[in-house]
């Protein structure tokens, strides 16, 4: 898969993207060089991963979508939704006008804020608090150093399911608003995958075969 790399020359003095707009919907990976601050796009719809290196963040007037992961050295912000087939990780905050959805984990050095729901296939971790207009759900743990809010939408009266926080376990944080439902962590499957064995003086790494 092809990787496009954006540098300072692709942005104007206001950090707005001025390059080829075909990159906004690109069938490949997108990388943004370090130390650019928060760079701004109309939207991003990337087939592969999006990576903004150290001290670079991403802001989109509309949505941000990646078939794989989204990672930024600083913040990630979208006027509508943020969606990744894999994980979403930001050195500072993650904020979306609509929902935030990740196939694996969501991790922010600061806060996580969504106008609608927050959903992760793995865990959710925030250096500050977590705020969602609707539900928060993940399969593993939720960790927050501060408070957690779910169901803060102002465009309707939230139903019970709109303010439910579903997770395997609440590892840290205070539920300030919302209904916590801890469903238990999935059992760890015993596997030899990745283990190193030595046979006749030679080392081999085991790989589990799919049935």
Each model region followed by its residue ranges:
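Thr-biased low-complexity repeat/linker tracts and other Thr-enriched repetitive architectures
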Residues: 56-134
């Amino acid at each position: 898969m092809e990787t496009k790399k954006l540098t300072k020359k692709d942005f104007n003095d206001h950090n707005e993207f001025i390059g080829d707009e075909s990159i906004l919907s690109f069938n490949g990976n997108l990388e943004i060089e370090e130390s650019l601050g928060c760079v701004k796009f109309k939207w991003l719809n990337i087939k592969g991963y999006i990576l903004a290196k150290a001290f670079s963040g991403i802001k989109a007037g509309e949505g941000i979508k990646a078939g794989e992961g989204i990672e930024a050295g600083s913040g990630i912000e979208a006027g509508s939704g943020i969606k990744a087939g894999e994980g979403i990780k930001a050195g500072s905050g993650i904020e979306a006008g609509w929902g935030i959805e990740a196939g694996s984990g969501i991790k922010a050095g600061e806060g996580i804020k969504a106008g609608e729901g927050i959903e992760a296939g793995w865990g959710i971790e925030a250096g500050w608090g977590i705020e969602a207009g609707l539900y928060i759900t993940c399969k593993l743990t939720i960790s927050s150093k501060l408070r957690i809010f779910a169901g803060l939408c102002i465009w309707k009266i939230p139903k019970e399911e709109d303010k439910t926080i579903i997770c395997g376990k609440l590892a840290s944080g205070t539920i300030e608003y919302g209904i916590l439902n801890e469903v238990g962590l999935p059992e760890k499957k015993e596997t030899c995958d990745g283990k190193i064995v030595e046979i006749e003086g030679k080392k081999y790494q085991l790989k589990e075969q799919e049935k």
